[in-house]
Amino acid sequence: GVLADQWKEFFYCDSMPPDVLMMKGQKRTGGRSSNTGGEDNIISNGSVIAVNNGQCMMIVDQGKIVEFSAEPGAFTYDASTEPSIFCGDFKEGVQRSFESFAKRFAFGGQNPKNQRVYYFNTKDIIGNKYGTATPVPFRVLDERAGIDMDIGLRSFGEYSYHICDPVLFYTNVCGNVEDEYRRQELDSQLKTELLTALQPAFAKIGAMGIRYSEVPAHTMELADALNEVLSKKWREKRGIEIVSFGVSSITANP
């Protein structure tokens, strides 16, 4: 009942496995607490929410974001205040996203029916394999030798990414999941878009005068080029971006 839900609770999230991108927080009541009737999706005013390193926390109220914290420590929920944000190491874009999507509801004395604490994995998501099924065009340009031609490249390797804007990630990707959201649900789409972006990214590398055989030594430039190509789909819509792009092998087809 409503009275049972007014007891303070403690929300936390254990260390998230590397394949989990978002997880619903776990509720713990004190050993002396009689809040046995508290509902899982109700957050009592004054509840404490723990945030560990490599995580950020978000409170949603009937699907709308009301609190956000990326700073490790203990966060105390105060339902009477305006929505708050503690960005931690995140860029100011998270602040703008929060201001766009956050909202405080007034319930006229009635408790909300669906509040949740979500935790996001802010560590680098590594080991994402990619491979070109067909050759990707690459421009070979050498003005001194008078060479200007296209060749096909096959490339294989791994890349890593991270969630750079959890507000966008929640709003446009995972939403109100019941328990957790795993990378496998997103992998296929990301891989397809990454391979599509390789062609314009290779074009940027080629325009810099980098030979195809030198590409493995210029993976930072390639990662920057991919982020530039993918910025609208990944960073500005989903709140994720490439951290590193590794090339384990690259071969040319004339």
Q: At which residue positions do the language-model features occur?
A:
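N-terminal hydrophobic membrane-entry segments
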Residues: G1-P254
